Amino acid sequence: MTNDALIAALSHLVSEGRNPDTMDIDLLSSQEIVERLNQQDKQVPLAVEAVLPQIAQAVDKITAAFKQGGRLIYLGAGTSGRLGVLDASECPPTFGVSDQMVIGLIAGGKEAMFTAQEGAEDNATLGAHDLQQIDFSSKDVLVGIAASGRTPYVIGALEYANDLGATTIALSCNPDSPIAEIAQIAISPVVGPEALTGSTRLKSGTAQKLVLNMLTTASMIRLGKSYQNLMVDVRATNRKLIARAVRIVMQATDCQREEAEALLKESHNNAKLAILMHLTGMNYEQATAKLSQSDGFLRRAMEEHEE
């Protein structure tokens, strides 16, 4: 694409428009600037609310893929790619899953997390190449993330995933974007022009973060990774998470700290098993077997025990 064509294409994007509410932002005090930014940020949850049906549809597809041994792959460039890597990296400690279950890919590789890799996002073949490097298959789900909705790296990856017969989801902040047309499910929270023209790390990035949070959190809940609103599959790998596991057991069972710590020790730091053991009187082996029979759903395991 020529520079003239690119300039023309960008001029039609909502995310690249000039925001009439911030035209004088360079004249404001620090207090006034942050108030103006905050006013803009308030628009983001409403934009996400408008696409909740599409987000729920994506959650159903992701959950189904997980149950069949598939993975969730986030792929993007720049801020979009970094947000995908961030959400993916939080899943193992939060939900006790493998670090291969949710994977984030960014144009330019690991170095791009810290330093912009010029030109990487413009390479359409690189997206497909990065998917091939992780043995992407039809069992997996690809979420292509691009605020503009037109990043070649993401377009190439979505087209490759479609050719394999995988589920494809597009996350963009512009309506009727190229990636929305390619993907099977289009999630397009339109947040409007940015406070700083074209700086899509602002409202667009915030909207993307909210959507990604929903995709993994809702999918993991659907897999039984929570009991009530407690993270019962938390992986206690540091002092804070160990303390959190103790609190989770206490909150779920109304037991005292000493008993919660003893239960966690007996269950090998597995909060879900500790809770099941306390509430049903099962020993470790019995609780492990019952939880396996209930596909990891703690509530279901307790209900089946009561029958």
Swiss-Prot record:
The keyword Nucleotide-binding does not apply. Its EC number is 4.2.1.126. Homodimer. The keyword Lyase applies. GO terms for molecular function: carbohydrate derivative binding; carbon-oxygen lyase activity; ether hydrolase activity. Pathway: Amino-sugar metabolism; 1,6-anhydro-N-acetylmuramate degradation; Amino-sugar metabolism; N-acetylmuramate degradation; Cell wall biogenesis; peptidoglycan recycling. Pfam families: GKRP-like_C, GKRP_SIS_N. A lyase-type mechanism (elimination/hydration) is suggested for the cleavage of the lactyl ether bond of MurNAc 6-phosphate, with the formation of an alpha,beta-unsaturated aldehyde intermediate with (E)-stereochemistry, followed by the syn addition of water to give product. It is an enzyme of class 4 (lyase). The active site is at 90 (proton donor), 121. InterPro entries: Etherase_MurQ, Glucokinase_regulatory_CS, MURQ/GCKR, SIS_dom, SIS_dom_sf. This is N-acetylmuramic acid 6-phosphate etherase 2. Belongs to the GCKR-like family. MurNAc-6-P etherase subfamily. Residues 62-225 form the SIS domain. It catalyses: N-acetyl-D-muramate 6-phosphate + H2O = N-acetyl-D-glucosamine 6-phosphate + (R)-lactate. Coiled coil: none annotated. Specifically catalyzes the cleavage of the D-lactyl ether substituent of MurNAc 6-phosphate, producing GlcNAc 6-phosphate and D-lactate. Together with AnmK, is also required for the utilization of anhydro-N-acetylmuramic acid (anhMurNAc) either imported from the medium or derived from its own cell wall murein, and thus plays a role in cell wall recycling. GO terms for biological process: 1,6-anhydro-N-acetyl-beta-muramic acid catabolic process; amino sugar catabolic process; N-acetylmuramic acid catabolic process; peptidoglycan turnover. Keywords: Carbohydrate metabolism, Lyase.
